A protein has these predicted regions:
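A short catalytic or substrate-binding loop motif that flags glycine-/basic-rich loops and adjacent residues
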Residues: 10-14, 88-89, 146
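A structural signal for short, well-ordered beta-strand segments
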Residues: 19, 72, 96-98, 150
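Unchanged
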Residues: 45-69, 76-132
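Short, surface-exposed beta-edge/turn micro-motifs
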Residues: 15-17, 24-27, 92-93
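Glycine-rich, aromatic-bearing surface loops/beta-hairpins
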Residues: 135-139
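Hydrophobic N-terminal alpha-helices or hydrophobic patches in metabolic proteins across all domains
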Residues: 142-173
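Conserved Nudix-box catalytic region and its N-terminal flanking loop in Nudix hydrolases
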Residues: 22-61
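Acidic, metal-coordinating catalytic segment for phosphate/diphosphate chemistry
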Residues: 1-18
Length: 173
């Protein structure tokens, strides 16, 4: 199984959307009714559907998310036979990230439940694919803060020491 990442590909090639999700600082995973494993929300693009709409629809259907912010991360591809690809040919999908702030009270999909986790699961439905997608997301996110300008407010008077860390001095310029 080979997973690759691209900035973009022809839109017609995108057949899947996967949405790495968090809620209140926890990872969001789905457990399918017919499996004892966990997976990231995602699924097939329907005929004539915009791929970003696929991502939003799958997130809503599989997690019950009703309030969320979602953004595209990159395009990924998978080469090799798996549960959703019996030919093994390279297939492409859109990888997104969502921060979910509200869930519906009930799920109305093939998912048995949604689980919020502090750590990534050990028993994945797609163990050769989805951990790599999360690794890519984490790399992209860490790169987005490196070199960023951060503005802070010092809440101590200049020329004083921090009350807990006596070696931390706020100099007067």
């Amino acid at each position: 199984m080979e997973v690759k990442f691209y900035d973009t590909v022809n839109d017609k090639l995108l057949k899947f959307a996967v949405v790495i999700s968090q809620s209140n600082g926890k990872w969001v995973f789905c457990k399918h009714k017919e499996r004892d494993t966990y997976e990231v929300p995602g699924g097939h693009r329907e005929a004539g559907e915009d791929i970003f709409e696929t991502a939003k629809r799958e997130l809503q259907e599989e997690t019950g998310a009703i309030k969320f912010e979602i953004k595209p991360i990159c395009v990924y591809s998978v080469t090799g036979k798996n549960r959703v690809n019996d030919t093994g040919e390279e297939t492409f999908g859109l990888l997104c990230f969502a921060e979910i702030t509200e869930f519906a009270k009930e799920l109305h999909s093939e998912m048995e439940k949604v689980v919020l986790m502090d750590e990534l699961p050990e028993n994945w439905t797609y163990p050769l694919i989805q951990p790599k997608l999360i690794e890519k997301y984490l790399r992209v996110e860490s790169n987005s803060i490196i070199g960023a300008t951060v503005t802070v407010t010092v809440d101590r008077p200049l020329g004083s020491y921090h009350p807990e860390y006596k070696d931390m001095y706020y100099p007067i310029n």
